[in-house]
Amino acid sequence: MEVFVTIEKAKDGSYWCQTETEILGGYLTSTGRTIEEAKENLNECLAETKEDLERRQMKKGIMMALALTAALTAGAQGTAEDYRRAAELPQKFAASQVSGWVSGVEWKDDSTYTLKYYSDPAPQQERSRRRPETRRTETKQGPQKLERHWMNEDDERWGAPVPSPDSTMVAYIKNDNVYVSQRDGKDERALSLDGTLGAYYSARIQWSPDGKYVAACRIRPVSQKRYVYYVESSPKSQLQPILHQQEYAKPGDERTQKTPCIFEVKTGRAVIPDNALFSNQYDLWGPEWLADSRTLVFEYNERGHKVFRVLALDAESGKVRSVIEETSKTFVNYSRHFRQNIKGDTQMIWMSERDNWNHLYLIDVASGKTLKQLTRGEWVVRKVLHVDEERGLIFFTASGMNKDEDPYHVHYCTVGLDGKGLRDLTPEKANHKATFNKSYTRLVDTYSKADQAPVTVLRTVDGGEPQVLAKGDISKIESKGWKAPEIFTAPGRDGKTPMWGLIYRPTNFDPSRSYPVIEYIYSGPGDAYVPKDFQSFNWYISSLAELGFIVVQLDAMGTSYRGKAFEEVCYKNLKDAGLPDRIAWIKAAAKRYPYMDIDRVGIFGCSAGGQESTNAVLLHGDFYKAAFSACGCHDNRMDKIWWNEQWMGWPVDSSYIECSNVENAHRLDRPLMLLVGELDDNVDPASTMQVVNALVKAGKDFELVVLPGEHHTMGGSYGEHKRFDFFVRHLMGVNPPKWSDLKKTE
């Protein structure tokens, strides 16, 4: 090597060379009779210096390693002792250990109630005197309709005869058509003749209040339903595997189409409306008659979820008009809407995000005009509980009304039907859970925070001082080492919008030590997920933290209750998952708490959280160093239609591909453990297996856990143990205790 900066000739005729070197942080000088000799001597000097330094560094490294080993021995993480403590936490910090913590309220009448406590003894189960169930059951009732799985679409073919308002007649479905007859079966008449297997009439028949009309939807079912097939590898009933099938519509699949039809009972006149206002259905709900016996109202959710209408069909003219229309460039969150008719069906209370915040509106049915916005402001109505027309009050829950409080806290409120007199019935700065009596004049309210023990009070709607009924006493669990999680806020990606979350620490926390960080993620969308109530034990987090981790959970952009724009970040972009906000939040926490080692950050989640945790190491592997993902909907084209088209839109386009963990699997450069239940009836297990296939083809190293007989799961105790070991190995850099050794200590 020839590195030098200066060559000069000395007075005695020799030459000297000088070079700057980073080895010693200074200069080396060498001399020689010739330039070549000086350079050679300098190179030899450099080599000797490097060898000497390497010997010294090796000696220093050995001393540091010995010191580190001693330190780890004194305060190791992920040890058998940590596992033992973690296993004890569910019982040690059980809710039953907190006296005065109300678990439920049962109103006997308007003034009498019973409180139930978590500390109450568990009720003894009554012994069953029934004979053991046999494989075959015979009844006198004949064939019965099988219980419908929650994933199955209701075909509306089943239904008992519907009596008329005066009980003299019945309407029913026969041979796919609408029939009426006297109650005794006489004078049977067909009101429709065009019903077929491929276009039949719904059994949900509606009589007009005056008995003049009946209404039923003509249904055009999908031409071919999609099914997911499962192989139950290890059934309890037999040795050989069992094949199961489950109806399972996916994004882009055909949808059932409905046309509300009206039949005049006396004349048989049919009113078949033009479907221009409801032609491209994701779904159609109703119909239902208004009190005037002339107007049939139904709700139309357009495919793609950008248009939602409340429509009215006139029984005389057959014309359809729009009473309410909601539109959005992204999505209308149809699962959040609320509608209730008041004032003899002449007005409707309607809930909408049309001004970016979820609020209540008063709508005139005849004109479709908005009469008044009943609530307004940069906060959200969460749920309408009760409408009392006599008192002119709407009872509802809300979040974000108080700017100096956690915006996710739930409060119970009332507002007048005229939009005046907004009141917060539960003013304490905490998360509230209340139960009203039947007349909505009193409520029992339990309020708490993640770091504040619960208090239960009795309130009156009219006001007055609340009566304290119970206070949670946490002294027992505190004496055993319980510590509340820390409520922590920090700006997200934009540098200004606060993100709210929790920081969990182990019971033996020592701020002088360094801790790996693990995030528990479920970013939805459709809700908020960070616990706001007091918890003595968090099932997925507390025991994991006890191994020697800092575990965090937060709600970031893409989740609910912070305004529509906050949630719309997810639109056609589920891969975002609020991860830029989460990374900023964790970095801010680590800046305040240097013991949080953000060079060792892991992440885990289930379902959507499974998709998001895998996505985190694929697209943000520079920050997230390991991921555990259970039952993930890794490719939104593979998951259920209703959840994915709501957030990813329709038709299925390139955004689905861009958000797919299958498409991005080749990016994996971090440890990843995938877990799936072979009978998952929520997320198609093939979603996980297709990621596995892509990882194998890309030559990536990963771990896979398949649980026989399990459904949508984080893996239970087995999955938890695998998750513990995974993070101990990859974030702590130590081998976890052998399972057999842990069993010996149990």
For each predicted feature, which ranges?
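Surface-exposed loop and turn segments in beta-propeller and other repeat-based domains
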Residues: 89-94, 141-150, 189-198, 251, ...
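A short, exposed loop/beta-hairpin motif centered on an aromatic-Gly-Thr core
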Residues: 24-37
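Serine-hydrolase catalytic core recognition
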Residues: 293, 299, 431-746
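Beta-strand-rich domains and repeat architectures in extracellular enzymes and scaffolds
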Residues: 90-121, 155-162
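Short loop/turn segments that connect beta-strands within beta-propeller blades
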Residues: 183-186, 265-268, 315-318, 365-367, ...
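Blade-terminus and WD-like Trp-Asp/Gly-His loop motifs, strongest in beta-propeller folds
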Residues: 105-110, 161-169, 204-213, 286-296, ...
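A flexible loop/linker signature enriched in serine peptidases of the S9 family
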Residues: 119-123, 154-157, 168-179, 193-201, ...
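Predominantly five- to eight-bladed beta-propeller fold
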Residues: 127-150, 194, 198-202, 216-273, ...
